[in-house]
């Protein structure tokens, strides 16, 4: 595997497509509430715990297989993670949870140039999600990629606050962010502060990639992820999600 990418519009050569097998909704905790269910009570979230239905998993896997087949037809080399049990318990000295899924590799890996970053995802249940991709990562490393993992965080309860849902519920106590909080624009990295990424995440990213400019965006959207809000299609053309971005709050890097 050869790794090099600085944007999302160049021709695609290789890609990882996830899996839906054994997807599991973990027990509620502040990190899960922050990312998915900030407006629900813990009692309401508890009703969701457990495996996704066979129907959902089967249909999701069929979609992923169809996507993989189509990409291969177009000449793209496709990699798939291992199937793993996501209901296995994860225990630390401070909390316990289960896994979630390995459906979305774009959530947990950020490619910047020749580097692959295992990001410090905002959910406790994703702390070991990258393990199912280990064989792929070793192949990338053998091909010359720089592979490193962000510092493992403690995911303290104090890292999340739900007093004001009009603001990000992720606090700035630890280095936490998901890869889709970053929109890659060549040597500029547009970083969204939201429920899925805080300012310390941006500071850490800038310290690791001093040759790039990390541009922090606060105002566009406080929910999870930025790549469904701002989509650069090519140089000079960007697609905005009109439900989240307006002429008053769009990222100023896109001003003419």
What are these regions (language model features)?
Residues 1-256:
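The feature marks the mature, well-folded catalytic cores of soluble enzymes
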């Amino acid at each position: 595997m050869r790794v090099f990418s600085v944007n999302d519009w160049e021709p695609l050569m290789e890609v990882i497509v996830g899996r839906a097998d054994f997807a599991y909704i973990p027990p509620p905790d502040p990190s899960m509430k922050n990312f998915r269910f900030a407006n629900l009570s813990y009692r309401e979230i508890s009703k969701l715990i457990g495996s996704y239905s066979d129907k959902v998993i089967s249909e999701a896997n069929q979609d992923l297989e169809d996507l993989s087949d189509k990409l291969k037809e177009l000449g793209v080399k496709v990699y798939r993670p291992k199937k793993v049990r996501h209901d296995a318990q994860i225990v630390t000295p401070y909390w316990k949870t289960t896994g979630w899924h390995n459906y979305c590799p774009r959530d947990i890996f950020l490619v910047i140039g020749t580097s692959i970053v295992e990001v410090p995802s905002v959910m406790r249940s994703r702390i070991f999600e990258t393990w199912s991709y280990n064989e792929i990562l070793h192949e990338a490393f053998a091909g010359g990629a720089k592979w490193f993992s962000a510092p493992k965080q403690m995911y303290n309860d104090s890292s999340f606050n739900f007093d004001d849902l009009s603001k990000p519920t992720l606090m700035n106590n630890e280095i936490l962010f998901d890869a889709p909080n970053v929109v890659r624009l060549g040597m500029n990295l547009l970083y969204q502060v939201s429920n899925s990424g805080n300012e310390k995440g941006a500071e850490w990213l800038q310290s690791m990639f001093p040759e790039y400019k990390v541009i922090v965006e606060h105002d566009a959207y406080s929910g999870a992820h930025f790549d469904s809000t701002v989509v650069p299609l090519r140089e000079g053309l960007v697609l905005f999600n009109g439900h989240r971005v307006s002429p008053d709050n769009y990222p100023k890097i896109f001003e003419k």
